[in-house]
């Protein structure tokens, strides 16, 4: 018998990259998971159902429907994606989740934020999360905020356009030797599961998640060591990238060029000592030598 038997975690955005990883980890740890999605008949939703998740349709733009979806749940994991909802929609959805969690007497809300948690950066996807976090802190629900830095998956996953983004425009606009904080989505999921298991150690905390700090030049060298060749780079012009992906990432990279971000790995390692370094992660993934320059996706930082 699992210590979590009878306790349900509702995952908002369960079919996205983070949501899928968190759902899988929670199921593996013995939680019952209510996977909330706009498309319960979709491929990703069906895969989660096959693992044992209770997949349900939910609309994060509708607080009343969320409150019904949260009924009887112990905790909620909340992640939004501005590539789907837009910036205003992300704020609305994130606030709705917090309000619905409070209304449903949820015992623990874990919110997936990102970035340095400072206002005024001009980076839309960071500003939205600052707004959602501020709102969530002011409602009556126990809260943990997780702020992962760059996903390691940005280096390999086709939907993030790595040849054009991470391996070309990011170093071009930010600088190839600027330090970058990295963490894998699977390690974020492990930490989220730990937060639900030990709420006393996590409630009220705002955690920047970084398991390794490597510049793009260092990541290129590690890639070469792992695969025997450098990562593929596609010299896409900035204007072209912004045309199909928007200006969020290019604004972010320019901001990171000119501003300091605390990239201390120790807090993450204290919580999750097995969190992977870039070298360990690339080695485990057997990184492909030719990541796609293009592909079907929602942008370089889809969540």
Model feature map: region roles:
Residues 58:
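Cofactor-binding loops of NAD(P)H-dependent oxidoreductases
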Residues 271-303:
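Amphipathic terminal alpha-helices
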Residues 207-208, 220-262, 295-303:
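Terminal hydrophobic/aromatic helix or amphipathic segment near a protein terminus
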Residues 265-271:
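Juxtamembrane extracytoplasmic segments of single-/few-pass membrane proteins
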Residues 192, 196, 223, 253, ...:
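Hydrophobic "lid"/C-terminal helical patch
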Residues 52-53, 143:
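Short, conserved active-site loop motifs that form the nucleotide-linked donor/cofactor pocket
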Residues 2-47, 61-64, 68-71, 81-92, ...:
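Oxidoreductase cofactor-interface core, primarily capturing Rossmann-like NAD(P)-dependent enzymes
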């Amino acid at each position: 018998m699992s210590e979590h038997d009878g306790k349900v975690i509702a995952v908002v955005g369960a079919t996205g990259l983070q949501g899928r990883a968190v759902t899988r980890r929670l199921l593996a740890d013995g939680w019952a998971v209510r996977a909330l999605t706009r498309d319960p008949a979709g491929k990703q939703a069906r895969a989660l159902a096959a693992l044992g998740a209770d997949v349900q349709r939910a609309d994060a733009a509708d607080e009343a429907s969320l409150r019904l979806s949260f009924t009887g749940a112990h905790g909620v994991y909340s992640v939004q994606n501005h590539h789907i909802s837009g910036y205003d929609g992300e704020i609305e959805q994130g606030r709705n989740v917090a309000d619905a969690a409070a209304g449903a007497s949820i015992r623990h809300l874990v919110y997936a934020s990102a970035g340095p948690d400072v206002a005024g950066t001009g980076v839309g996807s960071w500003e939205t999360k600052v707004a959602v976090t501020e709102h969530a802190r002011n409602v009556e629900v126990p809260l943990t905020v997780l702020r992962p830095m760059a996903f390691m998956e940005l280096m390999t996953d086709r939907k993030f356009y790595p040849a054009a983004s991470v391996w070309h425009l990011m170093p071009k606009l930010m600088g190839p030797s600027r330090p970058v904080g990295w963490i894998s989505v699977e390690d974020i999921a492990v930490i989220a599961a730990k937060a639900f298991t030990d709420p006393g150690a996590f409630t009220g905390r705002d955690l920047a998640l970084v398991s390794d700090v490597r510049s793009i030049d260092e990541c290129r060298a590690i890639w070469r060591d792992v695969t025997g060749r450098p990562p593929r780079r596609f010299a896409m012009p900035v204007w072209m990238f912004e045309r199909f992906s928007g200006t969020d990432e290019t604004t972010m990279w320019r901001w990171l060029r000119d501003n300091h971000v605390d990239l201390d790995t120790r807090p993450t390692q204290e919580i999750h000592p097995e969190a992977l370094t870039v070298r360990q992660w690339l080695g485990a993934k057997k990184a492909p030598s030719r990541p796609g320059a293009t592909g079907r996706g929602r942008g370089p930082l889809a969540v």
